Every structure is written in structure tokens, then in C-alpha cells.
């Protein structure tokens, strides 16, 4: 029986990170977490490229562009959506999620989802490095593992 698993070893892998500037007081923590996870697992800074975009809605387009470039083993998407008084949150969250998934499926490049969707600012802060860990770190680990899995399936 053959079992394929990804190891959390980022040596030799190249990563694209897309980070939203909207809610930057939170997304900056996600970015720090993602970079820390990549470096601690063997990536080097020159193999990490960061693209800043205005908001989370813009992330899927840039993810597609980076994935199609052929320069990266995985793409990490980081953003924060906080529910407001209108349905805007629901539309943006749904479209960003669909867009990120579609990029991965269309390009066969792992695209990890580090987008916080929270009802309150407090919940978002908790997911960006306090009580609930750091979703940027988590997204980076997913990117490493999936890049390794995909490498074995070629």
C-alpha cells in the first residue's frame, strides 16, 4: 500500500503570499505568522514573494496570476473580513472563498486559505495570534504540506 503525505519541510520551495491591506492591524499579524512558519520550516526569505492588495476581494485575481506564473510551489492568501450591519460581508466572504478554491483547481497549484471571517473585531484578533492561534501560520503550514503532496503526485 502506498501512502502519500506531505512533510512540513519548506526547503527549496517557493511561496507567493497575498495579503490584504484592509484591516491591516490584523492582516499584518497574519503575514508575520505565515512568514514565521515558512522560515521555521526551512524556507528562505528570497523564496517568499509578498503581494499587497487593497482588500480580500482582490486576492483571487492575484492568486491566479501568481499561480499561472509557474514561479511558486504554493500560494498563501491572507485577509480579514469582519461582519458589519449589511449583507456585504456575506457576498465578499462567499466570492473570495469560491475564487481562491477555483484558482487552485484551475492551476493545480496549492492555494491556502488564510482569510479570517469573523463576526467581531475581537474574534478576528483572537485568530491572528492570541487565543485561537494564528491563521496565517496555519495557512503557511497547509501551503507547505500541499506543495509536498503535489510534488509526489507528479
From Swiss-Prot:
Function: Catalyzes the formation of 6,7-dimethyl-8-ribityllumazine by condensation of 5-amino-6-(D-ribitylamino)uracil with 3,4-dihydroxy-2-butanone 4-phosphate. This is the penultimate step in the biosynthesis of riboflavin.
Keywords, comma-separated and alphabetical: Riboflavin biosynthesis, Transferase
GO cellular component: cytoplasm; cytosol; riboflavin synthase complex
Reactions that this protein is recorded to catalyse: (2S)-2-hydroxy-3-oxobutyl phosphate + 5-amino-6-(D-ribitylamino)uracil = 6,7-dimethyl-8-(1-D-ribityl)lumazine + phosphate + 2 H2O + H(+)
SUPFAM superfamilies: Lumazine synthase
Record protein name field: 6,7-dimethyl-8-ribityllumazine synthase
GO biological process, one term: riboflavin biosynthetic process
Associated pathway: Cofactor biosynthesis; riboflavin biosynthesis; riboflavin from 2-hydroxy-3-oxobutyl phosphate and 5-amino-6-(D-ribitylamino)uracil: step 1/2
Entries under Pfam families matching the protein: DMRL_synthase
Residues holding 5-amino-6-(D-ribitylamino)uracil: 22, 56-58, 80-82, 113
GO molecular-function term, one example from the UniProt record: 6,7-dimethyl-8-ribityllumazine synthase activity
EC number: 2.5.1.78
Superkingdom assignment: Bacteria
Family classification: Belongs to the DMRL synthase family.
Residues reported in the UniProt entry to bind (2S)-2-hydroxy-3-oxobutyl phosphate: 85-86, 127
Protein species of origin: Thermodesulfovibrio yellowstonii (strain ATCC 51303 / DSM 11347 / YP87)
EC supergroup of this enzyme: transferase
Active-site residues, Swiss-Prot/TrEMBL: 88 (proton donor)
Amino acid at each position: 500500500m502506498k501512502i502519500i503525505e506531505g512533510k512540513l519541510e519548506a526547503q527549496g520551495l517557493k511561496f507567493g503570499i497575498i495579503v490584504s491591506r484592509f484591516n491591516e492591524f490584523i492582516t499584518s499579524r497574519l503575514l508575520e505568522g505565515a512568514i514565521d512558519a515558512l522560515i521555521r520550516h526551512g524556507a528562505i526569505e528570497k523564496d517568499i514573494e509578498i503581494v499587497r492588495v487593497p482588500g480580500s476581494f482582490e486576492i483571487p485575481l492575484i492568486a491566479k496570476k501568481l499561480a499561472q506564473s509557474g514561479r511558486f510551489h504554493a500560494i498563501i492568501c491572507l485577509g480579514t473580513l469582519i461582519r458589519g450591519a449589511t449583507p456585504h460581508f456575506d457576498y465578499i466572504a462567499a466570492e473570495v472563498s469560491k475564487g481562491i478554491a477555483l484558482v487552485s483547481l484551475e492551476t493545480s497549484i496549492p492555494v491556502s486559505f488564510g482569510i479570517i471571517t469573523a463576526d467581531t473585531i475581537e474574534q478576528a484578533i483572537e485568530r491572528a495570534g492570541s487565543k485561537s492561534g494564528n491563521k496565517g501560520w496555519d495557512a503557511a503550514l497547509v501551503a507547505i504540506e500541499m506543495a509536498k503532496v503535489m510534488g509526489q503526485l507528479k
